[in-house]
């Protein structure tokens, strides 16, 4: 059973980084405020046990990671620090260059963009390797890196160490070679089972956990000022959602009549329960019966997505989604049936007419008004669930004089270098509203 430890002490005004000597001699701490919880956690790493560290976002996990690396360096060992994405790895690399009292050439940023032939030579010379788990796991498998050469491995966002993710393989290598592993995360799991799985995957025998309620952490938690703005859907949106609800319930009733749905009304079926219907259908034996069930089930899922889009995101995302169904190269019989539904055709026509007259979801007006009132030269981030909504928001803001930019992931074909460029321009003030998923 791992040793679980959490501090409840009040902050000590006399704390200093010198408490961590001799390791603090390897870290530039002049511009870093010492915090009791960080010092306590760092001291816990000194014992050499593999450890899970849980700390809320924004409370200095990077400082802890750098000191963990410094411990290995002091003992004459090398260190690895990994992060799930290249941009995050780059941030850690820049932090290590800035904070560790090492020649920058001793710190290597190792990502997939580095050619495999060069990686082996570069990795053999580096005292600290910072990179992505996919690249390092590939190099471990190919023999370009030997885990036994390292004294410590730090995994940022270690909650990814589940299933077949590269973190899991790296953690297994640490266990096999007896290398200390330190996992950092703000979210170890939503239930006990997931937390236990993470602990086992990391091989952690010690847990250092802090929450925003701990006395030594609370003073550093920034308060949130949450304001909820309620808007009422327009007449046209209410009309279309009513139409979609009617179509969905027609199909859901067919599933209800054969015992696959607990109710014929989709608003009374939790989404999680609805998704479970698919598992029940897979276990059906009769092929004809099964085909009809699958047809109605997929019909419901496709139109529920359309319902979610128009009710929460607006007319444009709804129309855009229906158009994406229409332009698919290989349309299923379900999609053909949906598109030929006269009720849906009328709903799409009404939505297009409303868009032509300049109507959109009332949230757009509320968002624009809020930003124009609150910005005053400041920056803001706007989050939306769907990429089509991001495009709508950005266009609306730009059309009204707000300097906005969308930020989407690689599924949209955006390269990491382009993502980094957007973030850099946001930091430099080239635009002051970032709209992202």
Regions found by a protein language model. Give the residues of each.
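Conserved helicase ATPase core of P-loop NTP-dependent helicases/translocases
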Residues: 114-122, 379-383, 389-396, 402-437
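Helicase motor interdomain insertion/brace
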Residues: 10, 166, 170, 207-218, ...
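Conserved pre-motif I regulatory segment
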Residues: 10-54
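Conserved Walker A/P-loop ATP-binding site and its immediately adjacent core
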Residues: 62-64, 77-98, 188-194, 385-390
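Walker A/P-loop
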Residues: 48-68
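Motif I (Walker A/P-loop) of helicase-class P-loop NTPases
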Residues: 61-70, 165-169, 367
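SF2 helicase catalytic motif II
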Residues: 133-194
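Conserved helix-turn-beta segment of the N-terminal RecA-like "Helicase ATP-binding" lobe
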Residues: 88-111, 199-203
